[in-house]
C-alpha cells in the first residue's frame, strides 16, 4: 500500500512541494528568505484580519479606531505593532530575496523572476494603501502626494486621479476603497506566490555555484524543512525584539497626529522601504520624468535576464561583478538615506548622482563587467 501523502490528491501536491521535493545539497541560508516571506505573509494576513474587526474606514473615526485598538482591545497594541513592523520585516526579507536572486543569477529562471516582479509591485501597492489607513498626517499627505503623481500621465492623468480619489481630494471614498483593496490584495499575493512556487518547481532551485545540481539532490524534508524552521526562529527573535522594545523605531512621528488637510507636514516622506524609489522620483525636476524613473527603478529588474552577458550564471567566481553588485547595494542605501532628507543642497546632487549610478550599474556597468570576465577567463 502506498503512503497516503503519495496517493491522496491534495497531500500529493504538498508532498511534491515541501516533503519529497529534490533540492540541491549546497543551498545556503540566502535560500531561506522564500520561506520567511511566506511566514511574513501569514503574520500579516492573520494580524490584519484581527485589526479589521475593530478598524473603521471612515475619515471621522479611522484614527480614533486605531487608538481604540491600542488602548482598549485585548492585546490590540501587540497586534497593531506586529502588523506595522511586520510590513518592515516583509520588505527586509523581500530585498534580501531579490538581492540573492541577482547575486546568484536566479533571474535566468525567467517565468519565476517575472512573477516575482509582479509580486513586488503587488506588495508595494498593498503596503502603500495600508499606510493610508490609520489616517494620520503622513497617511493623508502620503496618499495625496503619491496618487497625485498619476496626474503627470498625459491626457488621462487628471481624470484618473479623480477616479482613484472618488472625488476632488483624498477623502472618505478614497479611504474606504483603500481599505477594501488593502484587505483583498494579500490573498491575491498568496495566490501569486503559489504560481511563483509552481514555476520554480518546474526547473528546481538554483544553487550558489550556479551549476546544474541534478547529480546531487537531497529531499526537502527533513533537511531544508528544519533549516527553514531555524530561519523562522531567528526571524521571530529579531521581529519580537523590534515589536516589544522598539515598536515605533521604523514609523513616522507625524502619523501620531490625526490627518489635517489644512496643515502640511514639513517633510512628506513614505515608509523607509520606499525611500530609495522616492529619492529616484525626486531626483528628476520634471513630474512626468520623475514618475517614469520611479516605475523604471522597479521595472528595470525585468531586464536582468536580457542583460546577463557572463558565461557563468552565479557571481560566486566573478570578482568584478561582485564589486558592481556591492556598489549597487551601497548605492541603494545612499538613495534610502537621501529619500528621508529634505530637498536642499547637498542632498539634491547626491540623490541625482546616486540615481544615475543605480541605472548605470544595472544597464551598463554590470553587463560590461560580465564581458570583461569572459575575456579574462578566455571562456
UniProtKB/Swiss-Prot annotation:
Binding site for heme b b562: 83, 182
Protein location: Mitochondrion inner membrane
GO biological process: mitochondrial electron transport, ubiquinol to cytochrome c
Transmembrane segment boundaries: 33-53, 77-98, 113-133, 178-198, 226-246, 288-308, 320-340, 347-367
Entry annotated with the keyword Membrane: yes
Cofactor(s) this protein cannot do without: heme b
Keywords, comma-separated and alphabetical: Electron transport, Heme, Iron, Membrane, Metal-binding, Mitochondrion, Mitochondrion inner membrane, Respiratory chain, Transmembrane, Transmembrane helix, Transport, Ubiquinone
Quaternary organization: The cytochrome bc1 complex contains 11 subunits: 3 respiratory subunits (MT-CYB, CYC1 and UQCRFS1), 2 core proteins (UQCRC1 and UQCRC2) and 6 low-molecular weight proteins (UQCRH/QCR6, UQCRB/QCR7, UQCRQ/QCR8, UQCR10/QCR9, UQCR11/QCR10 and a cleavage product of UQCRFS1). This cytochrome bc1 complex then forms a dimer.
Name of this chain's protein: Cytochrome b
Amino acid at each position: 500500500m502506498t503512503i497516503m501523502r503519495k496517493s491522496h490528491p491534495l497531500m500529493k501536491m504538498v508532498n511534491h512541494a515541501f516533503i519529497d521535493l529534490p533540492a540541491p545539497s549546497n543551498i545556503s541560508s540566502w535560500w531561506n528568505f522564500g520561506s520567511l516571506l511566506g511566514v511574513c505573509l501569514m503574520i500579516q494576513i492573520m494580524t490584519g484580519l484581527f485589526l479589521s474587526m475593530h478598524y473603521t474606514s471612515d475619515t471621522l473615526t479611522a484614527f480614533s479606531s486605531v487608538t481604540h485598538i491600542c488602548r482598549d482591545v485585548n492585546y490590540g497594541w501587540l497586534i497593531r505593532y506586529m502588523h506595522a513592523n511586520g510590513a518592515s520585516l516583509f520588505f527586509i526579507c523581500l530585498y534580501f530575496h531579490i538581492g540573492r536572486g541577482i547575486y546568484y543569477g536566479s533571474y535566468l529562471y525567467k517565468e519565476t523572476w517575472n512573477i516575482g516582479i509582479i509580486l513586488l509591485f503587488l506588495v508595494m501597492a498593498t503596503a502603500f494603501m495600508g499606510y493610508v489607513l490609520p489616517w494620520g498626517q503622513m497617511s493623508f499627505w502620503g496618499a495625496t502626494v503619491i496618487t497625485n503623481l498619476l496626474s503627470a500621465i498625459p491626457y488621462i492623468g487628471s481624470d484618473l486621479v479623480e477616479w482613484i480619489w472618488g472625488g476632488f481630494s483624498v477623502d472618505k471614498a478614497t479611504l474606504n476603497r483603500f481599505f477594501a483593496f488593502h484587505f483583498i490584495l494579500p490573498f491575491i499575493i498568496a495566490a501569486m506566490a503559489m504560481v511563483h512556487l509552481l514555476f520554480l518547481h518546474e526547473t528546481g532551485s538554483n544553487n550558489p555555484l550556479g551549476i546544474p545540481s541534478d547529480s546531487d539532490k537531497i529531499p526537502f524534508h527533513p533537511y531544508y524543512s528544519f533549516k527553514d524552521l531555524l530561519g523562522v526562529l531567528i526571524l521571530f527573535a529579531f521581529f519580537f525584539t523590534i515589536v516589544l522594545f522598539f515598536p515605533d523605531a521604523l514609523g513616522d512621528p507625524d502619523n501620531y497626529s490625526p490627518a489635517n488637510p489644512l496643515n502640511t507636514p514639513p517633510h512628506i516622506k513614505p515608509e523607509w522601504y520606499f525611500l530609495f524609489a522616492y529619492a529616484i522620483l525626486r531626483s528628476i525636476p520634471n513630474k512626468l520624468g520623475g514618475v517614469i524613473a520611479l516605475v523604471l527603478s522597479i521595472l528595470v529588474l525585468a531586464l536582468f535576464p536580457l542583460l546577463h552577458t557572463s558565461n557563468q550564471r552565479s557571481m560566486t567566481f566573478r570578482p568584478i561583478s561582485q564589486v558592481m553588485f556591492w556598489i549597487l547595494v551601497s548605492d541603494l542605501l545612499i538613495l534610502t538615506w537621501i529619500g528621508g532628507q529634505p530637498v536642499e543642497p547637498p542632498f539634491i546632487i547626491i540623490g541625482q548622482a546616486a540615481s544615475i549610478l543605480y541605472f548605470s550599474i544595472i544597464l551598463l556597468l554590470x553587463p560590461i563587467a560580465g564581458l570583461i570576465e569572459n575575456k579574462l577567463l578566455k571562456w
